[in-house]
């Protein structure tokens, strides 16, 4: 076998059995390339999670076609062991070919519970390492260390200096490596044994990305002050002089050759913020310039040129993981913010590079979407990958994390670049706010009735075909989802039309002792967008002005005061575009909005 997927894909030969039932306790068939391989072989895949939802799709999309004599190959996936296949409905169990796959069969010499914690995207590297090194039967700790070394390229015994540790943590957090907690705990345990990092908050900065960036943010000004005073690297430790929120050594070797490249990138993408410095001219011609606060248009243009260059060399490939696009999107959004800043003079070369890059990204993303998007719907909801996963993700938090209350704020029409502006303004108003960013894919087409309803229903749009032109059923979908999770109707709140005005009515609603789950729609950004005539720069200006007003901060503070954990998302974004006027099409289009037309068939669309 050349890779682990061959163990699975060799079992799928089209036109043999129209129904294949698979016991898949480890979710192997839901891995991106497995899904792609199954689809390329002509199979459709359907997970058996909810009896009613499954029966609806099965009867409408497959059973009815089979009854007409049509040939379609269907794979039904049960997320449990082979012994549970008998729990499937009678017609499925007796009509389908039965298969079973699990990680233990693919990695027989490694600890099954440890391997099961690993993100399926890392199984390629692990499979290659298993073939190359042929380990004997490894126990739990030995398996953890094998994975750390050969999958994540972390050799704990070689981490002896601060620069060694920082290199590992920067790669972990900046590249978005998904190391399971059990492996992180083992790494910390081994580092503690070495006694090299007794004063480092390893548990905090290893497990929490935002805490790690906060750790670096506090120490960057200290580094700059030493560099301007001494012109050399820091050797002494003067942590007692500084009041640091994240405990640990005050002096960090940002200028180490293994660290510097990461530091430049995280400043370029806005993950760290430049620091104020009195004698900043000393650093003007050094690499540290990128992390020094200045309001000069020249410095912003310098940052933009470097960011565009970085993005141009890192556009995800055709076979990229969805997480690669998430990572790319953060830098892309930062580029949009800077390039739309009225103070920045776009040199002709940089402007042309941005235009070329936009064309390159549009083509690459479109190609990737055509190839991979259809499989995203089947991925597990934790971590969420698509908008309809969010509601199930919240439910997991309520059940597993002992969170008593959650509030989901859906900012209609908010794009990622505009979120960066809102986040910046909120951080200026409340320095103790703690943000943890992640991304999900919206639904295509990303209209509000389709994408936003998927959030509140917790289901793909196929389950609400009669309401994809309206959002009127959102309150019902939201209440129904939580009722199905075992919550009482009085515990669930849905309010839309937020964004300005008084919060008194909402405050009274959320003050009810039963209120535990709040779905709140903020439509202010969408209203700004629909009235905008000044492009991206105008959007950024008005979104910033709105964020500077007290409304959003007051809403967040009110929710926090009432014990809510806050999750903020968007149903879709927006981009600047040139319109084509208002086509006079009569009743040809089913939906004739100002920015979208929906047609009943391909012929009329053409």
Which role does the model predict for each range below?
Residues 1-406, 413-566, 570-606:
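…; additionally, a secondary subgroup of soluble metalloenzymes is captured
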